[in-house]
UniProtKB/Swiss-Prot annotation:
Signal peptide span: none
Subunit-structure text: In the presence of PdxT, forms a dodecamer of heterodimers.
Active site: 90 (schiff-base intermediate with d-ribose 5-phosphate)
Protein name: Pyridoxal 5'-phosphate synthase subunit PdxS
GO terms of biological process kind: amino acid metabolic process; pyridoxal phosphate biosynthetic process; pyridoxine biosynthetic process
Biological or metabolic pathway of the protein: Cofactor biosynthesis; pyridoxal 5'-phosphate biosynthesis
Amino acid sequence: MFENMMDLGSLRHGDELIKRGFAKMTKGGVIMDVTTAEQARIAEKAGAVAVMALERVPADIRANGGVARMADPLKIKEIIDAVSIPVMAKVRIGHISEAYVLESLGVDMLDESEVLTPADPFFHINKKIYKVPVVCGARTFPEAVRRIFEGAAMIRTKGEAGTGNIIEAMRHIRKVNDGINVLLRLNESDMKKVAENIASSYFILRKETSKELFGYDNFPDMDDLYYGMDSDKIINGILKTLKEIKKYRRLPVVNFAAGGVATPSDAALMMKMGLDGVFVGSGIFKSKDPARMASAIVEAAENYEDYKTIADVSSGLQGMEGLEIDNIERLQERGW
């Protein structure tokens, strides 16, 4: 269905075509978090379409606390050398320099990730300034629109990383899908109002500065708000993204599940919900049998409506120990 609705040749820029095209190559597959070259080889053997190189899986980041940053370049190089599939790496939200460093290492894709400690309290990276494609998380339809406007080549649910609990990933895909459903019913005037509302996130810094300087937050100068863009350019760019979504009746980039996928059935559920693929963080290498779990999740994602096969590959498997959401820090709330 995605192929029928997406005309890659109609995308706006050459770089955008290449970035979205690369991301689309992962469609239907599973991307696995790995912390060592050996884990990367296990993931590749199990059928992962790509691996995400990082220092610690989200469950360990959550348990250990502290500031979580990009992985050691040496570790990333070791993982790149160990496998033939694409290697991704996480960058802190808004950390322009980390993104350039990772790009220089030759990673195939960046993940501007809420799992790491954010670097910028106001803005995400302008993904259009990098040659390497970038994936971003989204809890809601407006978040997804903002990230695509900024140049994200792939969107994923945020879920609640490191918990083994699928409920938040399900919440996020429901909200994004319902946002699309509402958008399809809007006229041009209503779409402009939606664009203005979604764009308001980029005005927060200027409003705060205005209040600090003048005592009120409606300073009329709205130039140079985000990477040199004024308010009109931001609103029109977001409106253009909304029109693209309305045209295709879905996000114009691949949309993956992430955050809490811990079993083959979880992976099948996400595919059943219409997602294009699955990220698995802690769910594989925090399970009792990582190699079997990795293969089973790949099998379930590929055959998500073949419930007999899912039952067979799940038999005897034990998932990671899960966490209830209510009493933990919500990593998903990082980002804006």
